[in-house]
Amino acid sequence: MRAQIEPDFESARKKYDEILEQILAYTDYCDEFGDEDGEEYRKVEQRLAKISGKDMSKFSLHEWWEAEGAENLAFDIALPEPKVVPDRTKDELRQIVERMLAPVPEFDDDFLEAFYVRVTFACKGAYFAEFLKLNFAQTFSFELFERREIEGVMRELSANEIVEILWGKRG
């Protein structure tokens, strides 16, 4: 698959430690001094936006301990967003869908081992789900990846079925 479609793990790897450090430092600051007026939050948001190039409004630096942890939040902030790829192919779409449906492979690389699942999971914010939402806007739905009753049987759609639905009206 072309590099412009693949998640940019190398960029994420380069930014990850600095972003994680900012998140944990903010937590320590809040534990010691509080941040009732949100002034420190806004400062950290600005620093993270500068590091990542992302709109930080979709991330919560306050509640990471109730969500998936500081490490996952740091990765999500560090990973560059998917882009619109107007000349995507059906084969590339099939590769994406197959990755999303496949078990997570094992990696010798600790960074990939820890975070690869975050790009393939079919949920809001996951890289490939967001790529599909962006590039197949007319046909994408998270429900394509959920179990459903089909002809009286509870099952998931196959990769081919999902590809045909998504490709049907190219986004």
Put a short name on every predicted segment.
Residues P105-F115:
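Short amphipathic N-terminal alpha-helix
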